[in-house]
């Protein structure tokens, strides 16, 4: 799983580009009134919040809140949630602050090395292709 600075999410590939598993009904859940993604800030010393997701599975405008063990980021599009939590004791941070914390702890992650060959297509619930998965380059 990855989330980027625009709240886009990836649930189908690892950060190294390798396929993880199918999406299943995950995208359908993005049509909920409030979508909350609970994620670790990093996994195996690899930050989960990235500048850009490796593979787009869900658009950021449908993801409202990212909850990590080190803080909560609310999508700026959800001004109602920002206002509702303004005077709370919740550890609210920007998605950028959470990313900076993960990068400070883990270092900047390497971008995956990918070939041009497409090995999978990521489709939206209506069948529209929203991204592709490319073959990971062989190790030198």
Placement of each model-derived feature along the sequence:
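Conserved phosphate- and dinucleotide-binding cores of soluble alpha/beta proteins
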Residues: 1-140
